[in-house]
Curated annotation (Swiss-Prot):
Alphabetized Pfam families for the sequence: GatC
InterPro entries: Asp/Glu-ADT_sf_sub_c, GatC
Family to which this protein belongs: Belongs to the GatC family.
EC number from the UniProt entry: 6.3.5.-
Gene name of the record: gatC
Subunit annotation: Heterotrimer of A, B and C subunits.
Protein name, per record: Aspartyl/glutamyl-tRNA(Asn/Gln) amidotransferase subunit C
């Protein structure tokens, strides 16, 4: 897979990021380099290799899940300009 200039410009537009022509050209090379590295990783034979989350074995401390509302709704919306029944009200952005 490779990225072309049109793809970089399209992604920048979708992300609403201003990208100059020079930056877009530079990003094409950088993104293609990253994708090339990812393709190299996908070619590595990992048959028989056990999945791991860390280089060194670590045990995570666990706690029992408890469902609560946190009792902080009023604190959370206290600085919001407009709220209704502890919900944030925001302007409509999609027509």
């Amino acid at each position: 897979m490779s990225v072309d200039l049109a793809t970089v410009k399209r992604v920048a537009k979708l992300a609403r990021i201003a990208v100059s022509e020079d930056e877009a050209n530079r990003m094409v090379g950088e993104l293609n380099g990253i994708l090339g590295f990812v393709e190299q990783l996908s070619e590595v034979n990992v048959d028989g290799v056990e999945a791991m989350t860390s280089v060194t074995p670590m045990a995570m401390k666990k706690r029992a899940d408890e469902v609560t509302d946190g009792n902080k709704a009023a604190d959370i919306v206290a600085n919001a300009p407009v709220t209704d029944h502890n919900f944030f009200l925001v302007p409509k952005v999609v027509e």
